[in-house]
Amino acid sequence: MNEFFSSDRDFSEDVVKQQSMVVAQHNDLITKAKYDLTTNEIKVMDYIISKIKPADEEFDTVHSSLYEISNVLGLKRSGRTYNQLTNTLRNLRQKEVIIYNEDTETATVTGWLQEFDVTRTGQVEAKISLKLAPYLLELKSKGHYTQHVLSDTIQLDSKYSIRLYKLMREADKNRGKIAPVIKHTPEELAVLMSAPKSYASWGRLNDKVIKPAIDEINLKIIDMDLELHTKKRGRKVVEVEIYNTFYPRKHSIKNPVPMTNWLNK
């Protein structure tokens, strides 16, 4: 598309308020979904999901603007940025997400967005794919959901950091009373992180994906202090464990860091 967004229009909302919005999604969208999105594509989709209200029973059209999206994501506001965001929205409509349902033994294949419109002045209307409704709507009644503050994923620079962050949030079943942990074979972890096949060996996966993701999360996320452990059979790594040691491993604590349950508001 042409870079026709030549000037900023002030569609401003409080950026801090926007970044404090909660992203809630069914656990299957974190642990069983296969997709390959860029860092900014994940952030834009998280932003759109954060617009869903707790009581929504169907997807409403999300009304926003390229100005607002760039502001919330901390991007430089320019015609070039707006053009890139438009292409990001296009990719979210075209790129596949595959979610396997073990109960029905079916795989749902869909795009992230059903459709979107962008005006010449940069206003955006987007609608989430209807196939994602079971994973984003009426989560309180379904249970098995994970929530996080939008600002957490916005500040992460790597798509692998965001994927690992979401996995660790999903693993926090006891809201900080016991240290969350994920345990997988290197092969399973590579799939969950959507790592390329060239990172098939544990050494390469750790160097290029896992260690950098852990380092960035530990630096930027205030309630995460991730620690990596491996189990070996001979010289081969057969299991990977990642703990959030910000919380105690085995014993409960009297005053855990509070996490507001957005769905109970």
Per-range role (PLM):
Residues 1-265:
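Charged, alpha-helix-forming regions
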